[in-house]
UniProtKB/Swiss-Prot annotation:
Family: Belongs to the ATP-dependent AMP-binding enzyme family.
GO cellular component: cytosol
Origin: domain of life: Bacteria
Mod. after translation: Acetylated. Deacetylation by the SIR2-homolog deacetylase activates the enzyme.
Catalytic activity: acetate + ATP + CoA = acetyl-CoA + AMP + diphosphate
Gene Ontology MF annotations: acetate-CoA ligase activity; AMP binding; ATP binding; metal ion binding
Pfam families for the chain: ACAS_N (PF16177), AMP-binding (PF00501), AMP-binding_C (PF13193)
Keywords: Acetylation, ATP-binding, Ligase, Magnesium, Metal-binding, Nucleotide-binding
Protein name: Acetyl-coenzyme A synthetase
UniProt: Mg(2+) binding residues: V537, H539, V542
E.C. number: 6.2.1.1
Length: 650
């Protein structure tokens, strides 16, 4: 193996880990050669009401697409996260919660969490929620967010969690698409010392003329902040659970019955509702959580992701709780009120496993390691990275400053659509290279293809595809199966197209190089460029807009917008700020453009297609080798854009 920046598995870790390198190779080989046998065995890791006999019926043929796992079995996700632990671990802490203000802390045992979920599940039923209904959840990072999700799962309702940073318009589009009858929110959330007006955002979202399905809004009293109230529609969480029974039988769900919807950005602009089902997802989330983090019973596990993202679903709620872990949930941000907060929390709660994002690591790195002078970190055993590729400098800083050079780092690659981790090191099995996601998890068959779909062998670079299904895979785009087929299975026939590019080195390790479609990755969160463009163009003074990502020291990718104003409109710094606020209001803070360049024209082909590759290079300040511009209707546009570019490194 090439020794360039190789971090070898220590003998001590390999000896005590769930799998070493030889075991990984043997298990991986079996999972590919005999997937039925492999998953027949590993599907038993969760509890089934009616055991499955049929394991896998899958096809990536775009004319005959089929994704079915454990498909004649029945189960309940909530029972797998709660009930099955009660006999032996009722008193084990399930959730440790620390508020935005560190003085606010709670501990909830598995027994207590079970009671809370049962009561709230009964409360949902009292508000008319039935099996198969879609419930929208827009909550702060409090234990009740997990309670709401598990209560939905308990009674067979499908939850659709919306990230608490999204705007009323973004909430409205998701409520409309899912036709939710019930919305669950809080008066406010707390983040970085600021109150987030969640209830007000819901009120504004529900004023949208196309929102016609919502009958009830359940409101958790988090801060006691003042909220508007609509009698007959709005109801307090606490008043509902006060009288609710502590007993709630679980709904028996088919393995392929929906568990949740989660909307993700697509390149067309309309967020797509990724639909995950129950059986395969629970098997895969719990198995990846155990093996990737080398989880041992009773360990304290902290995933810093928001519950509104897939990482919060799979690795803060379903995976860890199915495995009986103690999960730390933090309401705020781990670098507030100071960069020392992350280390303080690891020490305060004796965290064994940390799963966080490169954006946070880079932000802490920029503040300087002196903030970790008082940090002990001796409890920490495994560290993970998620959301985007981690640059080698940040990887090494994470390893040295947070991990004190003794914690293996699992740099995980996966997507909302995949349900769980697909490419990752395993702590006791994989020598790591900073910046590489390394090798596939069991049952995962990655390949690299050229633009014609030809499989590339050996050390090479190409489009990252997957050749066969895995249990955690999404099943469809809600209400638009054709879009599912078109997005993932039409580009390369017989393969799942990830939308990412990657290279494979001489050791077979994968290095994710980023999106190859029109989606940008801001602070580990996917945003469709079309969404941001649509928001800009909806402003009355904007005639046209093109949005691309560009390298950003902290966020990984920043948002760079080229804007053509309507005839006669004057360019000004005030208008630039107004447009930034406009996008923030339309989509959310995450989508705010970092740089807006005025453009008298955009590089277009004669058929009117915007040539984004030129815009990406100019935004990245790579202006010496732009490539052939002869297909452009007006090549002179390029020179003007280069002269007026904003991201110069002079």
């Amino acid at each position: 193996m090439s020794s360039q920046s190789l971090y070898k598995v220590s003998g001590n870790i390999a000896a005590n880990a769930l799998v070493n390198n030889d075991q990984y190779k043997k298990m991986y080989q079996e999972s590919i050669v005999n997937p039925e046998g492999f998953w027949r065995e590993h599907g038993k890791r969760i509890d089934w009401i009616k055991p499955y006999t049929k394991i896998k019926k899958t096809s990536f043929d775009d004319h005959n697409l089929s994704i079915n796992w454990f498909y004649d079995g029945t189960l309940n996700a909530s029972a797998n996260c709660l009930d099955r632990h009660l006999a032996e671990h009722s008193d084990r802490v399930a959730i440790i919660w620390e508020g935005d203000n560190a003085s606010e802390q709670r501990k909830i045992t598995y027994g207590e969490l079970h009671t809370q979920v049962c009561k709230f599940a009964n409360a949902l039923r009292s508000q008319g929620v039935r099996r198969g209904d879609i419930v929208t959840i827009y909550m702060p990072m409090v234990p009740e967010a997990a309670v709401a999700m598990l209560a939905c799962a308990r009674i067979g309702a499908v939850h659709s969690v919306v990230f608490g940073g999204f705007s009323p318009d973004s909430i409205a589009s998701r409520v409309i698409d899912g036709k939710s009858k019930v919305v669950i929110t809080a008066d406010e959330g707390m983040r970085g010392g600021r109150a987030i007006p969640l209830k007000r955002n819901i009120d504004d979202a529900l004023k949208h003329p196309d929102v016609t399905s919502v009958e009830k809004v359940i409101v958790l009293k988090r801060t006691g902040g003042k909220v508007d109230w609509i009698e007959g529609r709005d109801v307090w969480w606490h008043s509902l659970v006060e009288t609710a029974s502590e007993h709630c039988a679980v709904e028996e769900m088919g393995a392929e019955d929906p568990l949740f919807l989660l909307y993700t950005s697509g390149s067309t602009g309309n967020p797509k509702g990724v639909l995950h089902t129950t059986g395969g997802y629970m098997v895969y989330a719990s198995m990846t959580h155990e093996y990737v983090f080398d989880y041992k019973p009773g360990e304290i596990y902290w995933c810093t992701a928001d519950v509104g993202w897939i990482t919060g679903h799979s690795y803060m709620v379903y995976g860890p709780l199915a495995n009986g872990a103690t999960v730390l949930i933090h309401e705020g941000i781990p670098n507030h009120p100071s960069p020392a907060r992350l280390g303080e929390m690891i020490d305060r709660h004796k965290v064994n496993i940390l799963y966080t994002a490169p954006t946070l690591i880079r932000a802490l790195m920029a503040e300087g390691k002196q903030h970790f002078d008082k940090y002990d970190g001796s409890s920490l055993r495994i560290m993970g990275s998620v959301g985007e590729p981690i640059n080698p400098e940040a990887w090494r800083w994470y390893h040295e400053v947070i991990g004190h050079e003794h914690c293996p780092i699992v740099d995980t690659w996966w997507q909302t659509e995949t349900g769980g981790i697909l490419i990752t090191p395993l702590p006791g099995a994989t020598d790591t290279k900073p910046g590489s996601a390394t090798r596939p998890f069991f049952g995962v068959q990655p390949a690299l293809v050229d633009n014609m779909g030809n499989i590339l062998e050996g050390a090479t670079e190409g489009n990252l595809v997957l050749l066969d299904s895995w249990p955690g895979q999404m099943r469809t785009v809600y209400g638009d199966h054709e879009r599912f087929v078109l997005t993932y299975f039409k580009t390369f026939r017989g393969m799942y197209f990830t939308g990412d590019g990657a290279r494979r080195d001489e050791d077979g390790y994968y290095w994710i190089t980023g999106r190859v479609d029109d989606v940008i990755n801001v602070s580990g969160h996917r945003l469709g460029t079309a969404e941001v463009e649509s928001a800009l163009v909806s402003h009355e003074l904007v005639a046209e807009a093109a949005v691309v990502g560009y390298p950003h020291d902290i966020k990984g990718q920043g948002i760079y917008a080229y804007v053509t104003l309507t005839r006669g409109t004057e360019e000004s710094e005030e208008l630039r700020q107004e447009l930034r606020q406009w996008v923030r209001k339309e989509i959310g803070a995450l989508a705010t453009p970092d740089l807006i360049q005025w453009a008298t024209g955009l590089p277009k082909t004669r058929s009117g297609k915007i040539m984004r590759r030129f815009l990406r290079k100019i935004a990245a300040n790579e202006v010496t080798n732009l490539g052939d511009a002869s297909t452009l209707a007006d090549p002179a546009v390029i020179e003007t854009l280069i002269e007026t570019r904003l991201n110069r490194n002079e």
